[in-house]
């Protein structure tokens, strides 16, 4: 092989090695020039160089990727998780509830809806709507579990004592 041909082959080998070992797509590799070099070469020096360099590395480029994937899949996941729910609710008010103050909160006797708090009904519908704001309350329910209730746009209807949430 001539010195300039040897240098071209060396550059081609380095390019192939870099792309192959970096696990990059080889679409942009100059395959036509590689095929031409292989056809023009009287002996298989180029193939020998490629095989020797490949054998010297002793690993395939994707072996490390498969090892990392296996470690990731075999890792134990935590059983602890968090869930969140958006609940819409409508609470029917009973006359047996105890009210405190002229515009204080209410606490229904013996019910999980005791977690909710609201304002005493105001005289006009516009005042009732203006006084409502998004609120959230948390506490123990009748089952002994913690409950979180979020209310929004709450205002009492005039005659039925139903609270619309």
Swiss-Prot record:
GO terms for molecular function: methyltransferase activity. GO terms for biological process: methylation. InterPro entries: FAM86_N. Keywords: Methyltransferase, S-adenosyl-L-methionine, Transferase. It is an enzyme of class 2 (transferase). Belongs to the class I-like SAM-binding methyltransferase superfamily. EEF2KMT family. This is Putative protein FAM86C2P. The lineage of its organism: Eukaryota, Metazoa, Chordata, Craniata, Vertebrata.
